[in-house]
């Protein structure tokens, strides 16, 4: 068994990530953007994950009030379009993080989009 040493792919507070092999063979990474502007972004690797096109990121959503969002998962439909689902919490947060989420403030959202790297 062999594996390479881990390398940093995203910047600080850009997590968690989800990987998908696209129909084109490229690898898509979607991740939560937990810095302003809060949302979900995507980038691609054309060389089996050896390098990532950090300069051509796609902003899929920028609708968060704060960094409590993310865990995106993406699938590619048979027509080639992409569907990314993620969660987002709106409203004020307890700075100590101990009061939890107010009912009605957490949502699951879906973004349908075209593969811009085709």
Question: Locations of the language-model features?
Answer:
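Asp-box/BNR beta-propeller blade signature and adjacent active/binding-site loops
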Residues: 1-118
